[in-house]
Amino acid sequence: MERITVTLGERSYPITIAAGLFDDPASFMPLKAGDQAMLVTNQTLAPLYLDCVRGVLENHGVHVDQVILPDGEQYKSLTVLDQVFTALLAKPHGRDTTIVALGGGVIGDLAGFAAASYQRGVRFLQVPTTLLSQVDSSVGGKTAVNHPLGKNMIGAFYQPVSVVIDLDCLKSLPARELSSGLAEVIKYGIILDRDFFLWLEENIEAVRELQHDALAYCIRRCCEIKAAVVAADERENSMRALLNLGHTYGHAIEAEMGYGNWLHGEAVAAGMVMAAHTARRLGQFSDSDVERVKSLLVRAGLPVNGPTQMTPESYLPHMMRDKKVLAGELRLVLPTAIGQSEVRGGVAHDMVLASIADCLA
């Protein structure tokens, strides 16, 4: 068992990583006998894990209710969020309840925002079941729903009380979803940890094959990096913005193509290559490093080109709604070397368009 702490003073919390955690009620602390909890999951995961997690909690004396939502990025919306609020109010659940987010990034983001909003804030546990949510979205307190004009535009910073990562969940994850998660894994190596990038170049196939030691190390290292960044910059005023490598381009793909048609990690992968080409055009990232990034993404089963249905010009309106835009100026996360990156403003739109064109299949 691995345990990492996200250090945020009184709001610090543990990330627990191991196989078989769903069988142990201690995994779901601080829930205890007599507590009330609302389990939030989706229609795909409910048959796989709901009875197990609910049973463990109820046998521990926790009073559990549940809400089962439709599955997919297109349902990360205010309309579906209202279903969670309705379930909480119907029972009813008070300010002493705990929301348990059992699912991937969509469930975690949506349930977390519900926790941040319901009666002005109730505690919640993240129980991520996808690689992407285990290495990224469950850690750090970003919660949100989408708007038709932009991804994650309505949300809050709201930290969980615990993150429970059961490695066994990945055995049921479709290969495409696993690859999607690997985009965020590779991102950490590009932006902050050259040694981890080198390790991934040697071990990416072992991770895709779910070999235990490689998988456990991979998830642990990602969580260590994310925890350190969040502890240093919880509200994304500086360093935390680096975690958005590829996302400014990628969110444009998701919004333009329709949420769910491109998985988040697929869009981020193409976006990271676009960012690499932008950095190359600025003279701060070598041709050989661009090729290394592309090669690793391909080996991870990810796209390195944007959708053929989009023109470079179709990206810009979405990119200008990015949360890093300040005073109307586009700001991009760009690599400066493998393991190093920066947030850079003032990049000419013509250069951005040319970099996107570099990645059109």
From Swiss-Prot:
Its cofactor is Co(2+); Zn(2+); NAD(+). Zn(2+) binds at E184, H247, H264. InterPro entries: Dehydroquinate_synthase, DHQ_synth_AroB, DHQ_synth_fam, DHQS/DOIS_N, DHQS_C. It is found in: Cytoplasm. It catalyses: 7-phospho-2-dehydro-3-deoxy-D-arabino-heptonate = 3-dehydroquinate + phosphate. One of its GO terms (molecular function) is 3-dehydroquinate synthase activity. Its EC number is 4.2.3.4. GO terms for cellular component: cytoplasm. SUPFAM superfamilies: Dehydroquinate synthase-like. CDD domains: DHQS. One of its GO terms (biological process) is aromatic amino acid family biosynthetic process. Pathway: Metabolic intermediate biosynthesis; chorismate biosynthesis; chorismate from D-erythrose 4-phosphate and phosphoenolpyruvate: step 2/7. NAD(+) binds at residues 71-76, 105-109, 129-130, 142, 151. Its main location: cytoplasm. Binds 1 divalent metal cation per subunit. Can use either Co(2+) or Zn(2+). It is an enzyme of class 4 (lyase). Keywords: Amino-acid biosynthesis, Aromatic amino acid biosynthesis, Cobalt, Cytoplasm, Lyase, Metal-binding, NAD, Nucleotide-binding, Zinc. Catalyzes the conversion of 3-deoxy-D-arabino-heptulosonate 7-phosphate (DAHP) to dehydroquinate (DHQ). Belongs to the sugar phosphate cyclases superfamily. Dehydroquinate synthase family. This is 3-dehydroquinate synthase. It comes from Pectobacterium atrosepticum (strain SCRI 1043 / ATCC BAA-672). The lineage of its organism: Bacteria, Pseudomonadati, Pseudomonadota, Gammaproteobacteria, Enterobacterales.
